[in-house]
Amino acid sequence: MERIEGASVGRCAASPYLRPLTLHYRQNGAQKSWDFMKTHDSVTVLLFNSSRRSLVLVKQFRPAVYAGEVERRFPGSLAAVDQDGPRELQPALPGSAGVTVELCAGLVDQPGLSLEEVACKEAWEECGYHLAPSDLRRVATYWSGVGLTGSRQTMFYTEVTDAQRSGPGGGLVEEGELIEVVHLPLEGAQAFADDPDIPKTLGVIFGVSWFLSQVAPNLDLQ
C-alpha cells in the first residue's frame, strides 16, 4: 500500500467524480461569484464487531492527501500543474504520507440504490461483512465540504460479529482499490481519536465519540 513511485501532478481535464463550476449570484444587492466542485453525495458506516470488541475501520492511500502533504512540506511543489503535461512531484515523500484511517465509505453514484443499500455494498466490498439494509441505524446526515463541494454525507451504524464476515474486504481490485481493514479495540478508541499524529478523517473522530457516548454505555462489555 505504501510503495508509491513516480508520483506526478497535472491538470484534471475530465473526471467522472467531480466538475469545477462557478456560481454567480447577487446577495443583498452585491454581485458575487463562488467556485465549487460538483461531486456525488456519500455514505459512511461505523461497524462495531462485538466478537472482537472493536470498531471496524479502513486504511488506504489517498492521492489528494499525499499531494497535499508534499505541498504543505515543500510549498510550491504543485505550481507546475499549469504546465502542458504532468510533472513529477519533487521531492517525493514516502507513501505513508498519504495513508489515512477512515470509516468504511462510498459514493452515492448508482441510480436506483437507497443510501442503506449503498452502505451495505461498501461494507461488503471494503470490510467483508454481509449486511442487510434493516441492520443499519442512521446516525446523522450532514453537509461536507461546504466551501468547496456542498455535498451531503450520511453515517450509519451497525453491530456485527465475526460470523458475518464472509469475505476478505479490501475493496474492488478492478477499480484500483487497495484497502486494509483495521480493528480498533474499544479500550484505546478514545486515545486513537484524540491522537493528532495518527492521520484520520473527521468521520472517525465523530464516529468514535458518538459510539462511546451513545452505544457503549448500553453494551455488556464484561
From Swiss-Prot:
Q: Which reaction does it catalyse?
A: UDP-sugar + H2O = UMP + alpha-D-aldose 1-phosphate
GO cellular component entries:
cytosol
The GO annotation for biological process reads: nucleoside phosphate metabolic process; protein N-linked glycosylation via asparagine; ribose phosphate metabolic process
Q: Which of UniProt's keywords are assigned here?
A: Cytoplasm, Hydrolase, Magnesium
- Disulfide bonding pattern of the chain: none
Principal location: cytoplasm
**pH influence on activity:** Optimum pH is 8.0-9.5.
Q: What EC number(s) would the UniProt record show?
A: 3.6.1.45
Tell me yes or no: is Hydrolase among this UniProt entry's keywords.
yes
Q: Where in the cell is it found?
A: Cytoplasm
* Any one GO MF annotation of this record: metal ion binding
Placement of sequence motif Nudix box: 111-129
User: Mind telling me which CDD domains this protein's record contains?
Assistant: NUDIX_UGPPase_Nudt14
Domain Nudix hydrolase positions: 38-206
Which co-factor is required? Mg(2+)
Q: Which PANTHER family match?
A: UDP/ADP-SUGAR PYROPHOSPHATASE, URIDINE DIPHOSPHATE GLUCOSE PYROPHOSPHATASE NUDT14
Subunit details? Homodimer.
> What protein family does this chain belong to?
Belongs to the Nudix hydrolase family.
What the protein does comes down to: Hydrolyzes UDP-glucose to glucose 1-phosphate and UMP and ADP-ribose to ribose 5-phosphate and AMP. The physiological substrate is probably UDP-glucose. Poor activity on other substrates such as ADP-glucose, CDP-glucose, GDP-glucose and GDP-mannose.
The protein's name is Uridine diphosphate glucose pyrophosphatase NUDT14
